[in-house]
Amino acid sequence: MSHEVPNAIDVRNAVKRYGDFTALKTISLSIRDNEFFTLLGPSGCGKTTLLRMIAGFEDVTEGEIFLYGEEIEDLPPNRRPVNTVFQNYALFPHMDVMENVGFGLEMLGKPKAQARARAGEILELVQLSQFANRKPSQLSGGQQQRVALARALAPQPKVLLLDEPLSALDLKLRKAMQLELKHLQRETGITFIFVTHDQDEALTMSDRIAVMSAGELQQLGDARDIYEKPANRFVADFIGETNLFEVTIKSRDGTRVLCAFLNGLTLTCDAVAGMDVGDRVHMSIRPERIKLRSSKVETENFQAQVVENIYAGTDVQTIVHLQGGMPLAVRTQNSEIGRSMTFEPGAEVFVDVEFGSARLLAN
């Protein structure tokens, strides 16, 4: 008989207030066992507050938090089977790497020999065995990050909390650490809860993402759903790049609606429940879902003029102006095919929006 594994974390109607200020407004979400879960949002959205509530560093004003079915909001941090990796790593400068990693185990009452053996295992996992006798000051930023990870993983917590741990690293090292973190999570089987404001980090590493803004949960889903099917204007604008327009729904035909832009142009897209003819809503079109052509091939092509090409290495962003000077960003790959679809400033072109790429959004 199979037994269903409970969720690693269940947050139920959690509220956090500081005096008259409400930092978290009735948040409910579940994080699965062995999941890489990301809390994503801009500064001040409440993501770190929620992480600290799970860790026990912040009290819960209202609501409940469960860890593998056990209610924990009243437990002190040292009685919760979680560990936290902080943004500043918090390594002990007077201890070498081996001592730093084994410190938590010794505090839990493990014999020194057993603590060193476990520290050696985890250092091998993070590929730092050769640096075991070095002090933190003798390590690079990326190596210090891996020591902090090793120290947090050594006691084998049920959940690992990571509070923007990559923000101090340069771009290339940050990219490498993203892959390493994902690998570590898979190797250890421990649930990771990762806090970041970086959309690329979230999309690269996460099994699922909770997008937060102003203390509220805006959307929860996997990376593809969050990017391809944003729940509202905030998510569409915050995740990746997009063109946002205010439109009016002019007519409906089954599952499709005809929308009019402020400049009078119209575009057909999928209908969305709760939106009716006459409603003024927002439309999102991702730049990579738009093609520029030298001649008209579809009935809904828009005529436009190229204003600027912005070279970005792997791709090129082209800014065009539609009727009435309405700007539109188009992104093409920097490849032979992509270059054949790039036009010089001043060129008259036709804009081809792939059907299904325009998405209507709640305000």
Curated annotation (Swiss-Prot):
InterPro entries xrefs: AAA+_ATPase, ABC_SmlMolc_Importer, ABC_transporter-like_ATP-bd, ABC_transporter-like_CS, Mo/tungstate-bd_C_term_dom, P-loop_NTPase, PotA-like, PotA_ATP-bd
Protein name: Spermidine/putrescine import ATP-binding protein PotA
PANTHER family on file: SPERMIDINE/PUTRESCINE IMPORT ATP-BINDING PROTEIN POTA, SPERMIDINE_PUTRESCINE IMPORT ATP-BINDING PROTEIN POTA
Broad enzyme group: translocase
Job description of the protein: Part of the ABC transporter complex PotABCD involved in spermidine/putrescine import. Responsible for energy coupling to the transport system.
Keywords associated with the record: ATP-binding, Cell inner membrane, Cell membrane, Membrane, Nucleotide-binding, Translocase, Transport
Location(s) in or outside the cell: Cell inner membrane
UniProt membrane topology term: Peripheral membrane protein
Entry GO MF terms: ABC-type putrescine transporter activity; ATP binding; ATP hydrolysis activity
Entry annotated with the keyword Transport: yes
Subunit structure of this chain's protein: The complex is composed of two ATP-binding proteins (PotA), two transmembrane proteins (PotB and PotC) and a solute-binding protein (PotD).
UniProt source species: Roseobacter denitrificans (strain ATCC 33942 / OCh 114)
Enzyme Commission identifier(s): 7.6.2.11
Taxonomic superkingdom: Bacteria
Listed SUPFAM superfamilies: MOP-like, P-loop containing nucleoside triphosphate hydrolases
PROSITE patterns reported in the protein's UniProt record: ABC_TRANSPORTER_1, ABC_TRANSPORTER_2, POTA
Reactions catalysed according to its record: ATP + H2O + polyamine-[polyamine-binding protein]Side 1 = ADP + phosphate + polyamineSide 2 + [polyamine-binding protein]Side 1
GO CC annotation, single: ATP-binding cassette (ABC) transporter complex
Assigned protein family: Belongs to the ABC transporter superfamily. Spermidine/putrescine importer (TC 3.A.1.11.1) family.
